[in-house]
Regions:
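A hydrophobic alpha-helical transmembrane-helix feature that marks the membrane cores
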Residues: 1-223
Protein backbone atom coordinates (compact mmCIF):
# COMPACT_ATOMS: atom_id res chain seq x y z
CA UNK A 1 0.00 0.00 0.00
CA UNK A 2 1.39 3.42 -0.98
CA UNK A 3 1.72 6.29 1.46
CA UNK A 4 -1.20 8.04 -0.24
CA UNK A 5 -3.42 4.98 0.14
CA UNK A 6 -2.43 4.58 3.78
CA UNK A 7 -3.21 8.23 4.55
CA UNK A 8 -6.49 7.98 2.64
CA UNK A 9 -7.48 4.85 4.58
CA UNK A 10 -6.71 6.50 7.92
CA UNK A 11 -8.68 9.57 6.87
CA UNK A 12 -11.69 7.45 5.91
CA UNK A 13 -11.52 5.60 9.23
CA UNK A 14 -11.42 8.91 11.12
CA UNK A 15 -14.45 10.22 9.23
CA UNK A 16 -16.41 7.03 9.93
CA UNK A 17 -15.43 7.14 13.61
CA UNK A 18 -16.43 10.80 13.86
CA UNK A 19 -19.81 10.21 12.22
CA UNK A 20 -20.46 7.24 14.51
CA UNK A 21 -19.52 9.27 17.59
CA UNK A 22 -21.81 12.15 16.59
CA UNK A 23 -24.69 9.82 15.76
CA UNK A 24 -24.39 7.84 19.00
CA UNK A 25 -24.01 10.98 21.11
CA UNK A 26 -27.03 12.81 19.72
CA UNK A 27 -29.18 9.68 19.77
CA UNK A 28 -28.37 9.04 23.41
CA UNK A 29 -28.73 12.73 24.26
CA UNK A 30 -32.25 12.74 22.81
CA UNK A 31 -33.15 9.64 24.82
CA UNK A 32 -31.75 11.04 28.06
CA UNK A 33 -33.56 14.35 27.61
CA UNK A 34 -36.84 12.48 27.16
CA UNK A 35 -36.11 10.28 30.17
CA UNK A 36 -35.19 13.33 32.22
CA UNK A 37 -38.43 15.06 31.22
CA UNK A 38 -40.43 12.02 32.36
CA UNK A 39 -38.56 12.01 35.68
CA UNK A 40 -39.28 15.73 36.11
CA UNK A 41 -42.97 15.16 35.37
CA UNK A 42 -43.08 12.37 37.98
CA UNK A 43 -41.37 14.60 40.52
CA UNK A 44 -43.81 17.42 39.83
CA UNK A 45 -46.77 15.06 40.16
CA UNK A 46 -45.45 13.70 43.46
CA UNK A 47 -44.85 17.25 44.76
CA UNK A 48 -41.49 16.20 46.21
CA UNK A 49 -39.90 18.49 48.75
CA UNK A 50 -36.44 19.98 49.29
CA UNK A 51 -34.96 16.81 50.79
CA UNK A 52 -35.73 14.77 47.67
CA UNK A 53 -34.32 17.59 45.55
CA UNK A 54 -30.99 17.68 47.39
CA UNK A 55 -30.71 13.88 47.50
CA UNK A 56 -31.40 13.58 43.77
CA UNK A 57 -29.02 16.38 42.86
CA UNK A 58 -26.29 15.10 45.16
CA UNK A 59 -26.74 11.53 43.95
CA UNK A 60 -26.40 12.60 40.32
CA UNK A 61 -23.13 14.40 40.91
CA UNK A 62 -21.70 11.55 42.96
CA UNK A 63 -22.39 9.31 39.97
CA UNK A 64 -20.79 11.84 37.62
CA UNK A 65 -17.58 12.19 39.63
CA UNK A 66 -17.15 8.74 41.17
CA UNK A 67 -18.97 6.16 39.04
CA UNK A 68 -19.19 7.34 35.43
CA UNK A 69 -15.40 7.67 34.87
CA UNK A 70 -14.99 4.02 35.93
CA UNK A 71 -17.87 2.64 33.86
CA UNK A 72 -17.77 4.83 30.74
CA UNK A 73 -16.08 2.10 28.72
CA UNK A 74 -18.42 -0.69 29.81
CA UNK A 75 -22.05 -1.64 29.26
CA UNK A 76 -22.81 -0.50 32.81
CA UNK A 77 -21.93 3.04 31.79
CA UNK A 78 -25.13 3.35 29.78
CA UNK A 79 -27.20 2.64 32.88
CA UNK A 80 -25.17 5.17 34.85
CA UNK A 81 -25.88 7.84 32.21
CA UNK A 82 -29.63 7.23 32.49
CA UNK A 83 -29.39 7.23 36.28
CA UNK A 84 -27.62 10.59 36.22
CA UNK A 85 -30.07 12.24 33.85
CA UNK A 86 -33.04 10.68 35.61
CA UNK A 87 -31.91 12.00 38.99
CA UNK A 88 -31.29 15.48 37.60
CA UNK A 89 -34.69 15.42 35.93
CA UNK A 90 -36.28 14.37 39.22
CA UNK A 91 -34.46 17.22 40.98
CA UNK A 92 -35.85 19.61 38.39
CA UNK A 93 -39.45 18.89 39.41
CA UNK A 94 -39.55 21.04 42.60
CA UNK A 95 -37.90 23.91 40.71
CA UNK A 96 -40.52 23.80 37.97
CA UNK A 97 -43.34 23.62 40.52
CA UNK A 98 -41.93 26.74 42.19
CA UNK A 99 -42.02 28.64 38.91
CA UNK A 100 -45.47 27.31 38.02
CA UNK A 101 -46.75 28.96 41.20
CA UNK A 102 -46.12 32.32 39.49
CA UNK A 103 -48.93 33.81 37.44
CA UNK A 104 -46.82 33.64 34.28
CA UNK A 105 -44.83 30.58 35.33
CA UNK A 106 -45.89 28.31 32.48
CA UNK A 107 -45.03 31.04 29.97
CA UNK A 108 -41.59 31.54 31.53
CA UNK A 109 -40.87 27.81 31.46
CA UNK A 110 -41.97 27.60 27.84
CA UNK A 111 -39.76 30.54 26.88
CA UNK A 112 -36.79 29.04 28.73
CA UNK A 113 -37.28 25.69 27.02
CA UNK A 114 -37.59 27.32 23.61
CA UNK A 115 -34.60 29.57 24.22
CA UNK A 116 -32.49 26.64 25.40
CA UNK A 117 -33.40 24.65 22.30
CA UNK A 118 -32.60 27.52 19.95
CA UNK A 119 -29.26 28.25 21.62
CA UNK A 120 -28.20 24.61 21.66
CA UNK A 121 -29.22 23.83 18.08
CA UNK A 122 -27.69 27.05 16.75
CA UNK A 123 -24.33 26.70 18.50
CA UNK A 124 -24.03 22.96 18.02
CA UNK A 125 -25.01 23.33 14.37
CA UNK A 126 -22.46 26.09 13.93
CA UNK A 127 -19.67 23.96 15.39
CA UNK A 128 -20.62 20.97 13.24
CA UNK A 129 -20.96 23.03 10.06
CA UNK A 130 -17.80 25.10 10.36
CA UNK A 131 -15.80 22.24 11.93
CA UNK A 132 -13.80 24.80 13.89
CA UNK A 133 -11.69 23.58 16.77
CA UNK A 134 -12.84 25.31 19.97
CA UNK A 135 -10.43 23.45 22.26
CA UNK A 136 -8.64 26.76 22.93
CA UNK A 137 -11.65 27.79 25.04
CA UNK A 138 -11.07 25.05 27.62
CA UNK A 139 -8.97 27.04 30.07
CA UNK A 140 -11.20 30.09 29.93
CA UNK A 141 -14.36 28.02 30.45
CA UNK A 142 -12.88 26.12 33.39
CA UNK A 143 -11.85 29.38 35.05
CA UNK A 144 -15.29 30.84 34.41
CA UNK A 145 -16.98 27.88 36.07
CA UNK A 146 -14.82 28.27 39.18
CA UNK A 147 -15.61 31.98 39.42
CA UNK A 148 -19.34 31.33 38.90
CA UNK A 149 -19.38 28.64 41.60
CA UNK A 150 -17.66 30.98 44.06
CA UNK A 151 -20.17 33.73 43.27
CA UNK A 152 -23.12 31.34 43.67
CA UNK A 153 -21.79 30.10 47.00
CA UNK A 154 -21.21 33.66 48.23
CA UNK A 155 -24.70 34.69 47.22
CA UNK A 156 -26.20 31.98 49.43
CA UNK A 157 -25.16 34.19 52.35
CA UNK A 158 -25.33 37.60 50.67
CA UNK A 159 -28.69 37.05 48.93
CA UNK A 160 -28.13 39.89 46.48
CA UNK A 161 -30.67 39.73 43.60
CA UNK A 162 -28.35 41.60 41.22
CA UNK A 163 -25.57 39.09 41.87
CA UNK A 164 -27.94 36.20 41.19
CA UNK A 165 -28.89 37.85 37.91
CA UNK A 166 -25.24 38.40 36.98
CA UNK A 167 -24.35 34.80 37.80
CA UNK A 168 -27.19 33.47 35.65
CA UNK A 169 -26.10 35.65 32.74
CA UNK A 170 -22.51 34.44 33.17
CA UNK A 171 -23.55 30.78 33.35
CA UNK A 172 -25.62 31.17 30.17
CA UNK A 173 -22.52 32.48 28.40
CA UNK A 174 -20.36 29.72 29.86
CA UNK A 175 -22.77 26.96 28.86
CA UNK A 176 -22.96 28.43 25.36
CA UNK A 177 -19.18 28.23 25.22
CA UNK A 178 -19.23 24.67 26.50
CA UNK A 179 -21.71 23.67 23.78
CA UNK A 180 -19.24 24.90 21.16
CA UNK A 181 -16.34 23.26 23.00
CA UNK A 182 -18.02 19.88 23.51
CA UNK A 183 -19.49 19.72 20.02
CA UNK A 184 -16.09 20.56 18.59
CA UNK A 185 -14.57 17.75 20.67
CA UNK A 186 -16.69 15.20 18.80
CA UNK A 187 -15.23 16.40 15.51
CA UNK A 188 -11.62 16.51 16.61
CA UNK A 189 -11.62 13.49 18.93
CA UNK A 190 -13.22 10.82 16.71
CA UNK A 191 -12.38 8.06 19.17
CA UNK A 192 -13.89 9.88 22.14
CA UNK A 193 -16.39 8.24 24.49
CA UNK A 194 -19.98 8.95 23.49
CA UNK A 195 -21.28 8.37 27.02
CA UNK A 196 -19.06 11.12 28.39
CA UNK A 197 -19.90 13.36 25.45
CA UNK A 198 -23.61 12.85 26.11
CA UNK A 199 -23.35 13.72 29.80
CA UNK A 200 -21.30 16.82 29.01
CA UNK A 201 -23.87 18.11 26.52
CA UNK A 202 -26.75 17.18 28.82
CA UNK A 203 -25.22 19.21 31.65
CA UNK A 204 -24.74 22.13 29.27
CA UNK A 205 -28.43 22.02 28.35
CA UNK A 206 -29.57 21.47 31.96
CA UNK A 207 -27.62 24.43 33.35
CA UNK A 208 -28.50 26.62 30.39
CA UNK A 209 -32.21 25.98 30.96
CA UNK A 210 -32.07 26.59 34.73
CA UNK A 211 -30.23 29.89 34.48
CA UNK A 212 -32.16 31.11 31.46
CA UNK A 213 -35.35 30.47 33.41
CA UNK A 214 -33.96 32.42 36.37
CA UNK A 215 -32.90 35.29 34.12
CA UNK A 216 -36.26 35.46 32.34
CA UNK A 217 -38.08 35.42 35.68
CA UNK A 218 -35.96 38.29 36.99
CA UNK A 219 -36.48 40.32 33.83
CA UNK A 220 -40.23 39.72 34.01
CA UNK A 221 -40.29 41.47 37.38
CA UNK A 222 -41.46 38.40 39.30
CA UNK A 223 -39.93 37.42 42.64
Amino acid sequence: MSNYEAVSARSSEAVLATNKLIRNTYTLLSMTLLFSALAAALSMFMQVGPIAYYLSFGGAFLLIWLVLPRTANSAAGLGVVFAITGLLGFALGPILNMYLALSNGSQLIGMAMGGTGVIFLTLSGYALTTRKNFSFMGGFLATGVIVALIAMFANIFLAIPALSLAVSAAVIMLMSGFILYNTSSMLHQPHGNYLLMTVNLYLNIFNLFIHLLNLLTALSGRD
